[in-house]
Swiss-Prot record:
It comes from Oomycete-like sp. (strain MacKay2000). Its cofactor is Mg(2+). GO terms for cellular component: cytoplasm; microtubule. Belongs to the tubulin family. Keywords: Cytoplasm, Cytoskeleton, GTP-binding, Magnesium, Metal-binding, Microtubule, Nucleotide-binding. InterPro entries: Beta-tubulin_BS (IPR013838), Beta_tubulin (IPR002453), Tub_FtsZ_C (IPR008280), Tubulin (IPR000217), Tubulin/FtsZ-like_C (IPR037103), Tubulin/FtsZ_2-layer-sand-dom (IPR018316), Tubulin/FtsZ_GTPase_sf (IPR036525), Tubulin_C (IPR023123). Residues 417-451 are annotated as: Disordered. Dimer of alpha and beta chains. A typical microtubule is a hollow water-filled tube with an outer diameter of 25 nm and an inner diameter of 15 nM. Alpha-beta heterodimers associate head-to-tail to form protofilaments running lengthwise along the microtubule wall with the beta-tubulin subunit facing the microtubule plus end conferring a structural polarity. Microtubules usually have 13 protofilaments but different protofilament numbers can be found in some organisms and specialized cells. This is Tubulin beta-4 chain. Mg(2+) binds at residue 69. It is found in: Cytoplasm, Cytoskeleton. Residues 429-451 have a biased composition (Acidic residues).
Length: 451
């Protein structure tokens, strides 16, 4: 079968990951001890995408948990599904990265990375036909960003032909957890551009807004935010795990969503999101799911798709519905909002339908979009980066771990290049395509003046 190895790193990644296994285990009818007590054969048919079957019919997640301090791991282990994981797959150091990307990437993380790779290798060897890796981490801290990107580049070397998908929590515009977030995030994006295949961009502020405005939660906790992320993660892989009329997998997703290799940063959305009180007042229909999916308020990262254009998008529906209706709706969206889609990619929405809906819903939809508006995220982080870097603020923490200022400069210009690439394709029209071909290598050059 097409297995996925799940890797979670750092506090944020571990907390999202722990929640993810609760959601997935619930879908497959696996209880916290790893025993199956579901009610349908379909739950078991492809359970081995995410689980290994151990002796005595126990199901063990294909998960690798890593952190540079034991704290979060202990709380995962003490959590509701803590006994599910294989004890050897917890890999942790004792020192912590202290929100320092250099510690995660070069010093502390580099010492621990080999033991993490051993565990990853073991998990990969137990797969029949490994499809790829999914990583949950944040870009603002030290471990998830520094060590996470180190691990991604190492896995890239060892498994160059496997899909590398990351769920990356980016720094929010208004809420900042760490002062040095812009540094850590920029250095991470620099790595993700080169080494990841698909990056799902999330950020806490957008998730808060969804919890607050749409779900009407007065005091959203991180648990609520993580639950939103996990529903999306589960939706993206649903057609691998359950039978469907129109299947999608990680590779198909990549092929349909990435027109140019560097532009692989996606937005996520999910429908139906309704507050607990008003659920029973609305009937779920394919048109309603579609319109909520494409709603800007529904995006799980702080970039407004109305400020850019979609290069490509993908909608994964779950539940009993006619594929004809899905296709009509997709066409409908493109025709009504044609100005928000680039015209030089004619059919830019991919859809897939999986027959089994998530627990407690009749039907649902997961949205993954490749929009040029995502540059807002990078622009914002880039501006904060430049402001601090110009004064060399906090730089001694990084150079003290053996980093060079040159690396910061490179990361900065790589991110600026990324922004201008998105901008270039946002402005491109079908007619003037010929103009780009001659000077295709040229558009990176004028950015280097931004230092």
């Amino acid at each position: 079968m097409r297995e996925i190895v799940h890797i979670q790193g750092g506090q944020c990644g571990d907390q999202i990951g722990a929640k993810f296994w609760e959601v997935i285990s619930d879908e497959h009818g696996i209880d916290p001890t790893g025993t199956y007590n579901g009610d349908s054969d379909l739950q078991l048919e492809r359970v081995n995408v995410y689980y290994n079957e151990a002796t005595g019919g126990r199901y063990v997640p294909r998960a690798v948990l890593m952190d540079l301090e034991p704290g979060t791991m202990d709380s995962v282990r003490a959590g509701p599904y803590g006994q599910l994981f294989r004890p050897d797959n917890f890999v942790f150091g004792q020192t912590g990265a202290g929100n320092n990307w250099a510690k995660g990437h070069y010093t502390e993380g580099a010492e621990l990375i080999d033991s993490v790779l051993d565990v990853v290798r073991k998990e990969a060897e137990q797969c029949d036909c490994l499809q790829g890796f999914q990583v949950t981490h944040s870009l603002g801290g030290g471990t998830g960003s520094g060590m996470g990107t180190l691990l991604i580049s190492k896995i890239r070397e060892e498994y160059p032909d496997r899909v590398m998908m990351t769920f990356s929590v980016c720094p929010s515009p208004k809420v900042s957890d760490t002062v040095v977030e812009p540094y850590n995030a920029t250095l991470s994006v620099h790595q993700l551009v080169e080494n990841a295949d698909e990056v799902m961009v999330l950020d806490n502020e957008a998730l808060y807004d969804i919890c607050f405005r749409t779900l009407k939660l007065t005091t959203p906790t991180y648990g609520d935010l993580n639950h939103l992320v996990c529903v999306c993660m589960s939706g993206v892989t649903s057609s691998l795990r359950f039978p469907g009329q129109l299947n999608a997998d990680l590779r198909k997703l990549a092929v349909n969503l990435i027109p140019f290799p560097r532009l692989h940063f996606f937005m996520l959305g999910f429908a139906p999101l309704t507050s607990r009180g008003s659920q029973q007042y609305r009937a779920l229909t394919v048109p309603e799911l579609t319109s909520q999916c494409f709603d800007a308020k529904n995006m799980m990262c702080a970039a407004d798709p109305r400020h850019g254009r979609y290069l490509t998008a993908s909608c994964m529906f779950r539940g009993r519905m006619s594929t004809k209706e899905v296709d009509e709706q997709m066409l409908n969206v493109q025709n009504k909002n044609s100005s928000y889609f680039v015209e030089w990619i004619p059919n830019n929405i991919k859809s897939s339908v999986c027959d089994i809906p998530p627990k407690g819903l009749k039907m649902s939809a997961t949205f993954v979009g490749n929009s040029t508006a995502i540059q807002e995220m990078f622009k914002r982080v880039g501006e904060q980066f430049t402001a601090m870097f110009r004064r060399k603020a906090f730089l001694h923490w990084y150079t003290g771990e053996g980093m060079d200022e040159m690396e910061f400069t490179e990361a900065e210009s790589n991110m600026n290049d990324l922004v201008s690439e998105y901008q270039q394709y946002q402005d491109a029209t079908a007619e003037e395509e010929g103009e780009y071909d001659e000077d295709d290598g040229g558009y990176g050059d004028e950015d280097d003046g931004m230092m």
